[in-house]
Every structure is written in structure tokens, then in C-alpha cells.
A protein has these predicted regions:
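Non-catalytic, conserved peripheral segments adjacent to functional cores
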Residues: 1-70, 87-133
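Conserved SET/PR-domain catalytic core that frames the SAM/AdoMet-binding pocket
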Residues: 67-85
Length: 133
């Protein structure tokens, strides 16, 4: 199964990351002001990807993974987050390298009125960073 073609992406991938999450974890929405784009792929389990267009307020969700093996491309202008619908292994490719000294991550709370009804849970497991968003 083909996962990705670099020639199909508008920008080159600069870094690939893996994340493992337990069912019920929400990674609250975040965005990148310097234009980092993300390509999301769930390798095992199921994940709900939630995207918010920060300019128009429009939202998009898709459940991806075992039952729907597709990748989701998110342009940098959009805020994005995910919910682990099952225990999962999640991969994301990004168009900028992460700089721990100057991170380009800006948060939006998981329960922001524009997206709070898009999650399947009302009592998620949140990291300290996501609780502080």
C-alpha cells in the first residue's frame, strides 16, 4: 500500500514523527504561524482528526486508521488536533523541523465552542500542555 508521494505535496516533508496514544486521549487543536503543513496517518487503531479553518471558522473531521486508511493533509493556516478513538499509533509528516528553542505551536482549547461537539468524548485524557491551552 502506498502511503505518500512527495511529488503530490505542495511543500517538501522535513520531519516525520510517531505518537502512540491511549483511547480517549485528545491532542487539543494547535496551529503553526510560520506555515508548517502537516500530513496525518494512523498506522494502527483509529483516530479522529479535527481541523478548524482559523479564517472562516469552518471545521472538518475524519476518522482515519484501520477502518479508513487515508492520510489527511492540513495546510498551516488551519488549527488541528486529534482524538484517539482506540489505542493507536499515529504518524505525522511536517514541512518544518521542530525547534525546541523556538517552537511554532499555538494552542486552542479542546472544548472551544467551534469544535467541542466534534469530539466523541466529553471527558478526554489531556496532557498538561493541552490542559493549559
Amino acid at each position: 500500500m502506498e502511503l505518500m508521494r512527495a511529488s503530490a505535496l505542495p511543500k517538501p516533508v522535513r520531519q516525520a514523527n510517531l505518537a502512540r496514544s491511549k483511547q480517549g486521549v485528545i491532542r487539543a487543536l494547535h496551529y503553526h504561524e510560520r506555515g508548517q503543513d502537516d500530513l496525518f496517518l494512523c498506522l494502527q487503531g483509529m483516530v479522529r482528526v479535527v481541523v478548524l479553518n482559523r479564517e472562516t471558522g469552518e471545521t472538518f473531521t475524519e476518522d482515519i486508521g484501520d477502518d479508513n486508511p487515508v492520510a489527511i493533509y492540513v495546510p498551516g493556516i488551519h488549527a488541528h488536533g486529534y482524538e484517539a478513538l482506540t489505542d493507536c499509533l499515529f504518524c505525522y509528516f511536517v514541512t518544518e523541523e521542530y525547534d525546541a528553542a523556538d517552537p511554532d505551536e499555538h494552542g486552542i482549547p479542546w472544548d472551544d465552542p467551534r469544535v467541542r461537539d466534534l469530539w466523541s468524548t466529553t471527558s478526554p485524557i489531556l496532557s498538561e500542555r493541552d490542559r493549559a491551552s
